[in-house]
Amino acid sequence: VNKSGGLIFYKNYSSDKNTLDINDTLRLASVWHSLHAISRTNSVSPVKKSSGIELLETSTFDLHCFETKTGIKFMVCSMKKAIGVERLLRRVYDVYADFAMKNPFYELEQPIQAELFEERVMIAVKSCRNANSGHYSGGGGGGGYASSLY
């Protein structure tokens, strides 16, 4: 999600048929961007200098967020209590820095359409899923880890 709340990358890694469609994903990203901005204000947050919402826990999934210093937000929708999601988000940020930001043809704040970026993100997701495969038993999130990244 870019600084304006626009979706610049989305990939669904779940084999589950009951996932959000692209329109719902756009709405979720937009709402999250707004809530994240509101939560950073001192009038709302009980914590001084709050960095905003980092985790939303629901009864069926968790939504994690990592915001970079440049304002780009990486979000992962995962199975409840997934382990190592923060590590995955930081790895995706590294991939973003290496394969989007260093790409002379990539325009900041625009959708990322780089095949190598997508391949490396997939490798990061698979690596984290493999590392966590023993912690979960089936259901949602396709293997118990990240089901969507945006």
Identify the function of each model-found stretch.
Residues 3-150:
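Acidic, low-complexity cytosolic segments
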